[in-house]
Amino acid sequence: MLMQIADFEIGLNNPLFLIAGPCVIESEALVMDVAGELKSITQQLDMPFIFKASFDKANRSSHLSYRGPGIEKGLTILEKVKKTLEVPIITDVHEDTPLQEVAAVVDVLQTPAFLCRQSNFIRSVAACGKPVNIKKGQFLAPWEMKQVVAKAWATGNKKIMVCERGYSFGYNNLISDMRALAILRETACPVIFDATHSVQLPGGHGTSSGGQREFVPVLARAATAAGIAGIFMETHPDPDRALSDGPNSWPLAKMQPLLETLKELDKVVKNAGFLEQSSE
């Protein structure tokens, strides 16, 4: 299924697109700098791009952790990014988020993985009529996402993406099964792979999550080779000082070489076609 986002279309057989940005809005200056650099990189690569940042991280490990600037200031900053840099915006919403207020600013709404089974929430977000990126829960088998998508589609909104971000594998660990990407295609939705949250070690530092960012390129290449519509990566100029998800964020300075590789891989895979679709 093809989906229109701003001025480009996304889909399995279309060129790879990027969702990227810092995990959380730390400051207007940082957000503008990161968004500007990502726009420059993706323009050079002719890669469609959606900027991502959160105004409120509601599921932090500790109540003392930084959550973001809040909705009022956060939306003001995201709107400035959108208007100044002319890039589409995605941000995550929660059960107590005033959805219409957010939908009036951003181009895509994102539902957190932990909330993918909350039926009323999924329906409410989809009912806004905006494109929605539904992140698959770390506790869900890929084929179970068909039912989540069905809840969203029941509102009449067919502009739904599904995002794989790893599966719980023991304590404080996630694992990525590349077969899940092919299974998620059966939802008929564009499939996204979150290469940075997939290397997260949830709660691994006790009061915060750990991560293994050195494996981001490995999983990003594998997912692109498996066949996806888009790649999701959180990035930061100095991940070790990021206020959220630093251990699994990919350094901004290393985004371009990684994206160059992914673009070439994507081209080869999609030009060759997907043999698994005719394997039976």
Curated annotation (Swiss-Prot):
Name where it mostly resides: cytoplasm
What EC designation does it have? 2.5.1.55
List, in alphabetical order, the GO biological process terms annotated in this UniProt record.
keto-3-deoxy-D-manno-octulosonic acid biosynthetic process
Q: Which SUPFAM superfamilies match?
A: Aldolase
Q: What is this protein called?
A: 2-dehydro-3-deoxyphosphooctonate aldolase
Known pathway: Carbohydrate biosynthesis; 3-deoxy-D-manno-octulosonate biosynthesis; 3-deoxy-D-manno-octulosonate from D-ribulose 5-phosphate: step 2/3; Bacterial outer membrane biogenesis; lipopolysaccharide biosynthesis
Superkingdom: Bacteria
Q: Name one GO cellular component term.
A: cytoplasm
The record's family statement is: Belongs to the KdsA family.
Q: Is Ligase included in the keywords of this UniProt record?
A: no
Q: Please provide the record's keywords in A-Z order.
A: Cytoplasm, Lipopolysaccharide biosynthesis, Transferase
Its EC top class is: transferase
Q: What's the name of its gene?
A: kdsA
The yes or no answer to whether the keyword Cytoplasm is present is yes
The entry's localization annotation reads:
Cytoplasm
Which GO terms label this protein's molecular function in UniProt?
3-deoxy-8-phosphooctulonate synthase activity
Query: So what does this thing catalyse?
Result: D-arabinose 5-phosphate + phosphoenolpyruvate + H2O = 3-deoxy-alpha-D-manno-2-octulosonate-8-phosphate + phosphate
- List the lineage, top down: Bacteria, Pseudomonadati, Pseudomonadota, Gammaproteobacteria, Legionellales
